[in-house]
Amino acid sequence: MNNNLVAEGDVEKYQRDGAVVLRSVLDDQALGELAIAVEQNMQSPGPWANEYAANSKQGRFFDDYVNWSRFDAYKKHALTGALAQIALELMQTTSGRFFHEHVLVKEAGNNQVTPWHNDDPYYGVNSNNSVSLWVPLDPIPEKIALRTIKLRRDFDKNFIPRRFVDQTAYVNDARGYEQFPEPQLLDESTDIESFAAMPGDIVAFHFRTLHSAPATTDYEGRRRVISFRYVDTDAVWATRPWKTSPPLEPNSLRPGDLLTDERFPLISR
């Protein structure tokens, strides 16, 4: 591994705050290959693709996930090279598993805000050690940048997730889960960080880290991002009191089983 990709201070910040930005860690070749794959993905969506602005005059908002087996660039960069090694370094482990990739493309003029949420309750896996690598393919200025809230005790809880479209809770009550905090409370947090980024940079955040992103209503450019998501080898299959996202089938996995099937490839260093 190129030790310059992740400095000791970056690891410390990630472990402390649940988020960190790494500057200029992907080269032009990697970015070009991923950009081509995103265009191919948009032309040939997977079964779980969404169009959040499909029936309006506003800019397109496309998202899709778990297509790494269809597009070689996703697979290549998820499993080998810089991304996998960065994930392992931030998780402070020598081996882990790739969970999935997630493509998010907001065209200019889209009014869909990505509301505050953390990813953990949406997923059908449990892992205390995890990381999402948020990879921008376009310049991300401050006005449309990803925002996170430092992972502190007040917000490091099991929350009932909310729907992005109308912010309603998935369920009214669930054992072991709390209602999600009011957005205004989160907006007023003194622990918010905003990560303006350029192609080649990566924003890394834990599955339990609260994060959000503004609309692109007043922005003239595209915002293409791929998130690559990883877990430690002790991650286990889990059920939730709601439909998980991605809606993966258990196949032979039972709650508490390690993620040892081929859908979750092993990475190591």
Question: Positions of the model-derived regions?
Answer:
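Short, conserved beta-strand element in jelly-roll/cupin
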Residues: G124-E142, R229-D232
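Conserved hydrophobic/aromatic beta-strand scaffold that supports enzyme active sites
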Residues: A19-V21, S132-P136, I192-S194, I202-A204, ...
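Non-heme Fe(II)/2-oxoglutarate
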Residues: W48-A49, A53-S56, F159-F164, I202-A204, ...
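Non-heme Fe(II)-dependent double-stranded beta-helix
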Residues: M1-R16, L22-W116, Y122-G124, D257-L258
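Short, structured patches in soluble enzyme cores that scaffold and shape functional sites
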Residues: H102, N118, V135-P139, K150
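Short, charged/polar surface micro-motifs in flexible loops or helix N-caps
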Residues: L83, A108-N111, P139-E142, D154, ...
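Glycine-rich phosphate/pyrophosphate-binding beta-alpha loops
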Residues: D119-P121, S130, S212-T216
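Double-stranded beta-helix
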Residues: P141-L210
